[in-house]
Amino acid sequence: MKAIGYQTMGSLAQADFIEFTTDIPELGAHDLLVEVHGVSINPVDTNVRRRAQPEQQPKILGYDAAGIVKQVGLNVSRFAVGDEVYYAGDITRPGTNSEFHIVDERITGKKPSSLSMAEAAGIPLTSITAWELLFDSLGVTANDNESILIIGGAGGVGSILIQLAKKLTNLTVIASASRQESTEWVKKMGADHIINHSKPIDREIEELGIQPKYVAALTGTDEHFDAIVNLIKPRGSVAIIDNPEALNINSGKQKSIRFSWEFMFTRSMFETADMDEQHKLLNQVSDMLDNGILRSTVTNNLGKLSPKTIVEAHRRQESGRVIGKNVLEGFFSNL
């Protein structure tokens, strides 16, 4: 099969993406062989590219996909050949920037019928991250009448997290943005209040007169952590998804703040007993998209998968100015 990978880790200038030919991996008992029609770019793509040196062949990135099931493993029960699926994959396996891809059915969902393949590929990773952060890491319940602060509301995770919080809970949603276009996008996603994270966020929150019980720190956690401790309710909860260089959480002791990480690959990496929860939530998100309850967060289709378009997608991701999601058409796209 054809695939796109890089040969040298490091900066984007060093990342020599090439198209090459490689074998299709063998199916495991719960695996699907998917013909890939759409992929997307996430921060994990650029993080891996900077840190992971390929070994015997170029490293294939890509942690979102939508496509058609072409073959199933012996124990597969959730899907059949010909089904259209979408998923975020497993960081321990080769990525989705290829003609075909192997994925466990337990972390795969039915593709939203209302979205194109490329648009559907922009949904899984951010939806899983947002869902797990909201309900597992923060422990929010449907009838919760508290408030949540989402730092970095205009990115891929923030865009879907705002919607999930508004549609599935009673939370008041405060989201941060720093530019006019990102502020407008966050408002479009449904945020009740918007603050500017280029200013001290504890002062911004104080001016609102709201003390959030929950904080979702999606970016700049090390920069904002002291302010988070100041603004959060006693016995509140903080969940983060970024990679702060150093974080002293002792300042949260007096308020008995609950602190947790969200990493959506945990279930697949460790094959947890509940990894099927990702299959279930992706199906629910798919239904919500098809019923108009959720809206797509995709803002740009960068064209067909190639070394050139991958480099452009990585450049945009690393600019720090991404709103929503960037997607690419797969090798099999007719566009």
Predicted region positions:
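C-terminal substrate-binding/catalytic core of Rossmann-like NAD(P)-dependent dehydrogenases/reductases
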Residues: 251-301
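Glycine-rich cofactor phosphate-binding loops and adjacent beta1-alpha1 units
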Residues: 142-143, 189, 194-262
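Glycine-rich beta-strand-centered segment in the early N-terminal region that forms part
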Residues: 23-40, 50-92
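NAD(P)H dinucleotide-binding glycine-rich loop of Rossmann-like/cofactor-binding domains
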Residues: 88-152
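C-terminal capping/lid region of NAD(P)-dependent oxidoreductase domains
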Residues: 290-300, 311-335
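Mid-domain Rossmann-like dinucleotide-binding core that forms the NAD(H)/NADP(H) cofactor-binding site
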Residues: 123-199
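Short glycine/proline-centered loop/turn elements that form peptide/ligand docking sites
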Residues: 74-75, 175-185, 222-223, 246
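Residue-level marker of beta-strand positions
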Residues: 66, 83-84, 100, 147, ...
